[in-house]
Amino acid sequence: MCNPSTTTTTTGSENQESRTGLFLDLFSINSFEPTKRNLRHCENRGSPLMAEAVTEAKSLFTLAFPIAVTALVLYLRSAVSMFFLGQLGDLELAAGSLAIAFANITGYSVLSGLALGMEPLCSQAFGAHRFKLLSLTLHRTVVFLLVCCVPISVLWFNVGKISVYLHQDPDIAKLAQTYLIFSLPDLLTNTLLHPIRIYLRAQGIIHPVTLASLSGAVFHLPANLFLVSYLRLGLTGVAVASSITNIFVVAFLVCYVWASGLHAPTWTDPTRDCFRGWAPLLRLAGPSCVSVCLEWWWYEIMIVLCGLLVNPRSTVAAMGVLIQTTSFLYVFPSSLSFAVSTRVGNELGANRPKTAKLTATVAIVFAAVTGIIAAAFAYSVRNAWGRIFTGDKEILQLTAAALPILGLCEIGNCPQTVGCGVVRGTARPSTAANVNLGAFYLVGMPVAVGLGFWAGIGFNGLWVGLLAAQISCAGLMMYVVGTTDWESEAKKAQTLTCAETVENDIIKAVVASTIDGECDEAEPLIRITVLY
């Protein structure tokens, strides 16, 4: 923790002392004093726990609702792209689906996971009133993601050869590569979009992102109509439309935030500091990426396993319908997860562990209720939901049989997703990664393969495997959250944000030369920030 004391020391002869001074300027935490006074005020006023919980619930809802709207808009945009691919023909739909799956596995999931490494840094720094750290972390993350785009781009340029090597149809593989090449601008815009969203969300600023997403959705449909239907660019037009839409979203978001001055309290111009001092970010980004990818990739593996079952055409199609369904239901717990991660990070950064614990508790209760509602929804629409996507009787039968299992999965998925958000807010992404690895691949995968193939249950056996994974993940995550030492996490938050500041100050420490001019007596020759 940063030492609150300040010490000034002089050295050298009297002649030297008259010209220069050597200052050991220890970092002060005076900026925390208002927070401490507020905390004492809250503790002394004796407000009931229920009233505090209601207040916290309102704060979470205020954050989560616009995030959910944004996610639903993105879901709608994806559906529009799939619609235009389907209108082009079976070959284009298959190639586009393969390209999107490859892009998700090798690109979008990776960038999304790596960007989440900045979330605890930004939310805790904002709570600790270390505003400069927010923009510095934003700059570093953008540079980091741009660097990561280089190997991803190489993969995308060679997806045709990779797909043929994996025994995919050569025509489908060639078209998939075309789609991905024209999606590269979209990949690059994500290196800006993800960090900006997190930078704003850490400050509780959500509405600009929602407005930008809504504007993008309005822009996306005419862009597809113009490029695909009018110019007849085919599959290439769908990819270009997605790229142009995201460029429009980023431009709208940046212009809106800049014009409204929302960036002003925490903004600093980019400097060479964004090219160094990456250690704290990398320590959080790596495990965050692993955690996201382990869960994201599971669903892609499920599609591959469906292709090995009897009548793969129907099982793969039914799995696609159900994954679209669970993606829709996932919008709500994931939005709550982002909200609770921000709130927990803010409170720990402000050194309010009791409030952080209350936030986590309220969010998990919300998640449990959300899971029950999702399960009831899945069960009630089991015989009708599939008709939105297809009229094939066999696909409809598979979908109707698996939807109740999907609903049970949501009872576990909602709490574990929100629990993962709590863990992210405490800057422990490696814990979430370990939980996902154990639950999905050491429990869920063996159960899915065993029931789906060895026991002969087939399609439903794969979904029972997912149910086992979600139950295990929820149980482990609740244990992690329940055993969290909140006082210790608050201290770690102070250390994390202070250590980042100290690292930058040490890097920038210089010895001032006084040969060419007089040095003001109040200006130190060396300024050193010390972390105890």
Curated annotation (Swiss-Prot):
Tissue: Expressed in the meristematic regions. Mainly detected in tissues where cells were actively dividing, such as leaf primordia and young leaves, the junction between lateral root and the primary root, root cap, hydathodes, the junction between secondary inflorescence and the main inflorescence, young stamen and young siliques. Highly expressed at the junction between the hypocotyl and the root, and at the marginal areas of cotyledons and true leaves, coinciding with the locations of the hydathode. Also highly expressed at the basal regions of the newly emerged lateral roots.
A matching Pfam family: MatE
GO biological process: defense response; negative regulation of defense response; regulation of auxin biosynthetic process; regulation of organ growth; root morphogenesis; xenobiotic detoxification by transmembrane export across the plasma membrane
Residues spanning the membrane: 65-85, 98-118, 142-162, 176-196, 208-228, 238-258, 290-310, 316-336, 358-378, 395-415, 439-459, 461-481
Summary of the knockout phenotype: Enhanced resistance to bacterial pathogen PstDC3000 in RNAi mutant.
Main localization of the protein described in the UniProt heading: membrane
Subcellular location: Endosome membrane; Late endosome membrane
Keywords carried by this UniProt record: Endosome, Membrane, Plant defense, Transmembrane, Transmembrane helix, Transport
Function of the protein: Functions as a multidrug and toxin extrusion transporter that negatively regulates plant disease resistance. Plays an important role in maintaining normal plant architecture, possibly by regulating local auxin biosynthesis. May act as a negative regulator of hypocotyl cell elongation in the light.
Protein name: Protein DETOXIFICATION 51
Source organism: Arabidopsis thaliana
Gene for this chain: DTX51
